[in-house]
Amino acid sequence: MQYIDDAEFQVAIDPDAGGRIISLKWREMEFTVPFRGQVHTYGWYPMAPWAGRIADGLITSPTTGVHQLPTNIDPPNALHGFGLSSSWQVVGPGHLLLHLPAPYKGATVEQRYEVLDDAIRWSIEYDANGCDLPVWLGQHPWFARDLDRGGSAEIEFNPGKMMKRDEKLPTGELILPTAQPWDDAFTEVRGTPAVIWEDVARIDIESDAPWWVVYSEDPEGVCIEPQTAPPDAANLGMVGEHYVEALYVFSEACFHFQDSENINN
């Protein structure tokens, strides 16, 4: 376990639990969803070498053909990559390295967590090392819906387009955003996404990521996920960058003036 204790932040990172943040406290308030029995429903974890679902867990290399990925988390689809269920090597404080298994064998992923005065900087980088399989990356923070004080979490999120979804998988068609709840991919996001606990705190998520997935269907947590491409990107003929970074800026929230559901209605 790694611990970073810096001024107003206390962060616990578990390299053996997907290299994820399992606890993040700011001003003594816990902002992460704790372990609930499933590997994909707690903490803040990396999604690599793919983010979201891949239909039937099938990924295609231009040189070695079709490969079957694990589908045990969300059958029949592959979900969120190898990173969340792997043990990561500790390189330094907040710096972790993962050597990927087959069929991505030879490739690596590095992630860094850096605690600043009022923010957490989180980056994930993929190095192919000759592997030609499709890759796209993402960050999956689970924000606790309720803190020990103040209002429940609300999402401030203003997307221009939403990818239409068929069951659990995006179709590739862009549509106008619907109202919440969401388990959907978005692009052309205006402004800075945020999670707000009225009268207590807000977290603004600053990232150049071209895609975002928002999950607001869980009673205990909400997720705003910067990604380099949408779920099932390879099957949609899309590619993603091999680097994603976001700055999670913490501040007091004295009032709440607008939310995405009001924006889209």
Language-model region placement:
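Beta-strand-rich N-terminal accessory domains
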Residues: M1-G65, R190-A209, Y243-E261
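Hydrophobic residues embedded in beta-strands of well-ordered beta-sheets
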Residues: Q2, H95-L96, I120-W122, P193-A194, ...
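Extended, loop-rich substrate-binding clefts of extracytoplasmic carbohydrate-active enzymes
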Residues: Y3, P70-D117
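Active-site/ligand-binding surface loops and adjacent short beta/alpha elements
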Residues: L133-P134, W142-D208
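Glycine-rich active-site loops that engage anionic ligands at enzyme catalytic sites
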Residues: W197-P231, G237
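C-terminal structured interaction module
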Residues: C223-N265
